[in-house]
Amino acid sequence: MMNFWSALYRRKRSVRLQLLVMALVPLMVLLPVLLVMGISRWNNDYNNLLIAKVESELQVAEQYLQRIVGATGTSVEALAASLAIQKAAEDGRLNDFLTAEKDALGLDFLSIVQPKSIDEHMQKWPVVQSALTGTARTAVDLFEADDLLMIDVALAEQAELILIPTEAAVPSDKVAETRGMMIHTAAPVSINGSQRVLMGGILLNRNLDFIDTINTLVYQRKNTAEDPRGTATLFLEDVRISTNVRLFENVRALGTRVSAEVRSAVLDQGQTWLDRAFVVNDWYISGYLPIYDSFDQRIGMLYVGFLEEPFRLVKRDAIAMMWIAFIGVLIVFIPVFLRLAGGIFSPLERMTKTMRRVETGDLTARNNLNRTGGEIAEVSHHLDT
């Protein structure tokens, strides 16, 4: 037994083993470690690049929303100060004039009201309060169904959405969303010497032109069922009220809801979400930001995002190619290293065998190595002589 362990110990300490370890450890251990570290760093950089991409796209969407809000306010304020509205009032065609201007400005409603006819319910809006004190103001606010009915029955009908059960959303017993998200503006206007308020607005529920324009600005192409990679959505709280995310074919995911994780971060905590997120039925690299009303309350979210799958496949293929290249290096260079190592330990093993023969009494034993074999061959020659 002792002879066995002694032999094993000597074998472990043999030159052959040491040389093999020296030759193969860098290839079999160090290189894989370096490769894993490199892949991990590359993977993080790649993910950061995707996040930076969606962040810039979210900024474009936010700027467009702000531009619409600003343009709506500027247009209504300019109209209130124009001579055209005064002339229309003098000619008794104010209603026709407002209807034409509403269509020209792309508004969903435009009307003039007297301060005394504005009930307490309408006066709750800071936008209206500001106009009553002589200053125009524009904001995004939530209108209850009754508010919309007072303006136009068609707006109440446009706003209503049946809620669709959505995977990963916060559980809710609510079956429909009847409120409307409105960009509304109010400006003071003088009609025949009487101070009044010019009010106008754009309903964002089912406003597909608005959301498709955002998608075109961000992704430079129109989203279709066949190419749904770039998406944009407007949320009223956590409900999709305008979106080009598809449920299937050309059916938009109106009435579906955001995931509980995103709702908590954006609506509850006021954070901007820049990460992967589950959107209706797939994973997207997503950007969400909160939308605030005139009371500085979070009332919804603006979202842009693109499918993760194409980028995940590119990343998977790239990592696979790195490992294939590494394995190819091993296949090519391990035989080379073994051959180089063999050029060292083979002469040494031959010398060891020769010395053992001499120890057993065979004085004719010789190494007979070629002297051109380097330093080891020189040592072998001296031993032979």
List the predicted regions and their residue ranges.
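Short hydrophobic alpha-helical segments used for membrane anchoring or interfacial signaling
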Residues: L110-K116, T224-D227, T231-V239
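Extreme N-terminal signal-anchor transmembrane helix of membrane signaling/transducer proteins, especially
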Residues: N3-F4, R13-N44, W323-I327, I331
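HAMP signal relay modules and closely related sensory coiled-coil linkers
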Residues: G343-T385
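Cytoplasmic juxtamembrane amphipathic helix immediately C-terminal to a transmembrane segment
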Residues: Q18, M22, I39, N43, ...
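Membrane-proximal amphipathic alpha-helices
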Residues: L31, L35-G92, A104, V280
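Short, hydrophobic beta-strand elements of compact beta-sandwich sensory domains
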Residues: T185, S194-L204, F278, I285-R312
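Membrane-interface helix-start motif
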Residues: F306-A325
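Extracytoplasmic/periplasmic sensor domains and loops in membrane signaling proteins
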Residues: R93-A100, A104-V175, N207-R221, S242-A277
